[in-house]
UniProtKB/Swiss-Prot annotation:
Main enzyme class: lyase
Residues passing through the membrane, by range: none
Coiled-coil ranges (or none): none
Pfam name, any one: DPBB_1
Organism for this UniProt entry: Yersinia pestis
Protein name per its UniProtKB record: Endolytic peptidoglycan transglycosylase RlpA
PANTHER family: ENDOLYTIC PEPTIDOGLYCAN TRANSGLYCOSYLASE RLPA
Occurrences of domain SPOR (ranges): 283-359
Lineage, opening ranks: Bacteria, Pseudomonadati, Pseudomonadota, Gammaproteobacteria, Enterobacterales
Domain of life the protein comes from: Bacteria
Residue numbers with lipid attached (S-diacylglycerol cysteine): 18
GO MF, one annotated term: lytic endotransglycosylase activity
Length: 360
């Protein structure tokens, strides 16, 4: 009998030891994204601590809103609205003065300030905006975009968008659903405003030996732009907002050949009315502006896209690569207005977004 109790005691001890020992934690396998990566523009995410004064649960018109405490995996689909000049000068939830030309947005429950990638579901255009205000409070609306952001996404009253949160770590690293398949163009300048077509015509772009002195060249981050190869046409990049553009009719920007004033003496380079196939001078490439249309992770697709754009718009172009990212650029142009004119044509005729950068 004692032996039986002894065995029962031993079994109990062993059983309790098994129960008290916590199970070994299962290591979660992080799924990596292996699809295409596209570069998009917009507000450049920077680390900003959440403002505790504007991140408390609140109530508006009898409706309670609970602030999302952990938005690391936040995504949302719904209708977007926009606000512009009618709200200029108003104070946002962060205490900033609202500027309709800034790439900002209002969201009812996301932490402030934060950054999100907004995608127009109907046309695929994407942009990064900074959330610095509360709203909208209209049923069915999930985000309120500034006029500048809405214009670049081509938002209407019935446009459905997808919101993906971008987490910015203190060291500046980016993660979250807003970074899946995306790289963000680093830029230290404001995106160009829409050109005034009534002020000047869209003339043929001219490549001069050197850009005009005193031209207002806005500061940019040139570390991501490689030297311009004049022997290849430069495709205008729309920062990957759209897929390959549709054919466009021949327009005003037919060539980028240099203009010869009167009677040149040394004529190795002859200006012809057709598209330029000769190599521009190194001084023309080393200054001026290019229009960046998009960035792809496939070199062959980027080259094909660039050649198609160069042929249809009658401008030179090239594909500039940085690591595994291939940027499609058009130009260079000696005057910024020429780049603005081409940018407007890309938007109107090909529904293609783009931005202007200084040529290396």
């Amino acid at each position: 009998m004692r032996k039986e109790w002894l065995w029962v005691g031993i079994a109990s001890v062993l059983l309790s030891a098994c129960i008290d020992q916590p199970p070994a934690p299962q290591q979660q396998v992080q799924q990596t994204y292996s699809g295409p990566v596209e570069e998009i523009g917009g507000a450049e995410p920077r680390y900003e601590p959440f403002n505790p004064n504007v991140n408390q649960d609140y109530k508006v018109n009898g409706q309670s809103y609970r602030i999302i405490k952990d938005p690391q995996n936040f995504s949302q689909i719904g209708l977007a609205s926009s606000y512009g000049e009618e709200a200029r000068g108003n104070t946002t939830a962060t205490g900033e003065i609202f500027d309709p030309n800034a790439l900002t947005a209002a969201h009812p429950t996301l932490p402030i300030p934060s950054y999100v990638r907004v995608t127009n579901v109907s046309n695929g255009r994407q942009i990064v905006v900074r959330v610095n205000d509360r709203g909208p409070y209209t049923p069915g609306r999930v985000i309120d975009l500034s006029r500048a952001a809405a214009d670049r996404l081509n938002i209407s009253n019935n446009t459905k968008v997808k919101i993906d949160f971008i987490n910015v770590a203190p060291d500046g690293s980016l993660s979250g659903p807003g970074m899946v398949g995306t790289t963000i163009a680093k830029q230290s300048y404001a995106l160009p405003s829409r050109p005034d077509l009534t002020s000047s015509g869209m003339g043929t772009p001219m490549q001069q030996d050197a850009p005009a002195t005193g031209a207002a060249v806005q500061a940019i981050d040139n570390s991501q732009l490689s030297g311009t190869d004049a022997t290849q046409p430069v495709a205008s990049q729309s920062s990957g907002f759209l897929r390959a553009p549709t054919p466009v009719p021949a327009g005003v920007l037919e060539s980028s050949e240099p203009v010869i004033d009167s009677a040149p003496v040394t004529p190795p380079v002859v200006a012809n009315p057709g598209p330029v196939t000769t190599t521009p001078t190194s001084s023309a490439i080393s200054g001026g502006y290019v229009v960046q249309v998009g960035a792809l992770s496939d070199a062959q697709r980027a080259q094909s896209w660039q050649q198609s754009l160069s042929q249809r718009f009658g401008v030179p172009g090239k594909v500039s690569n940085s690591g595994s990212i291939y940027r499609v650029q058009l130009g260079p142009f000696s005057h910024r207005q020429q780049a603005v004119d081409l940018q407007q044509r890309l938007s109107n005729e090909a529904q293609q977004q783009s931005f202007i950068v200084a040529a290396p």
